C-alpha cells in the first residue's frame, strides 16, 4: 500500500548505485507518480554553511547537515517535517520557523506514473511503515538496519546481512 509516510527499503536486487541500502520516505504519491527523499545519506555540508543564518539551526536535529535526498534535482533544497503524523514539505522561504524540527535534503527521488509500482512488483523495494523518528534520527547511518530490524518475517533477517554477501 503506497501512500505518504511509507518507507521504501532498497532490496539487494536493486541495481541502481544511487539506492544501495537506502531508505526513501515517501512524501507524495498520486496518479502522476511518487516523490520521496533518502533518509540515510548525510553529506558533509552543514546546514549553517549552506544557508548561513537564514534557518534556525536548532530546528535541524543532529547531525545538522544537508542530506542527499536523491538523484533528481540535486540543486533543489527540500525541507521535510512531520505534521499530523505525515511527512510534509517545509516552505523554506516563508514558514520554516513554524515547521518544528525538520531535515534538509539536496535533491529527491522521483518516479513516473506506475514506475514505482513496477519496481516494487519486481522486488526492488520493500514497503514498510515509517515514523517521525526515522526522519529525525541522530544516527542516519544505522537507520537501514534499525528499520529492517523492527519488521517481522524475512525482511527482519535482512538487517543482519553484510553489504557484501561474500563476507557472510
Question: Over which residues does each language-model region extend?
Answer:
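A short aromatic-anchored loop/beta-hairpin motif
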Residues: 1-168
Amino acid at each position: 500500500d503506497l501512500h505518504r509516510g511509507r518507507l521504501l527499503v532498497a532490496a539487494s536486487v536493486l541495481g541502481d548505485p544511487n539506492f544501495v541500502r537506502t531508505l526513501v520516505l515517501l512524501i507524495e504519491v498520486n496518479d502522476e507518480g511518487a516523490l520521496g527523499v533518502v533518509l540515510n545519506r548525510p553529506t558533509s555540508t552543514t546546514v549553517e554553511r549552506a544557508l548561513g543564518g537564514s534557518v534556525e539551526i536548532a530546528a535541524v536535529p543532529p547531525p545538522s547537515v544537508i542530506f542527499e535526498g536523491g538523484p533528481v534535482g540535486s540543486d533543489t533544497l527540500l525541507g521535510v517535517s512531520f505534521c499530523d503524523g505525515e511527512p510534509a514539505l517545509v516552505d523554506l522561504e516563508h514558514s520554516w520557523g513554524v515547521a518544528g524540527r525538520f531535515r534538509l535534503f539536496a535533491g529527491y527521488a522521483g518516479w513516473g506514473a506506475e514506475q514505482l509500482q513496477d519496481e516494487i512488483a519486481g522486488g526492488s523495494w520493500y514497503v514498510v511503515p515509517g515514523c517521525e523518528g526515522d526522519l529525525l534520527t541522530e544516527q542516519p547511518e544505522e537507520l537501514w538496519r534499525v528499520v529492517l530490524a523492527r519488521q517481522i518475517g524475512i525482511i527482519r533477517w535482512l538487517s543482519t546481512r553484510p553489504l557484501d554477501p561474500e563476507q557472510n
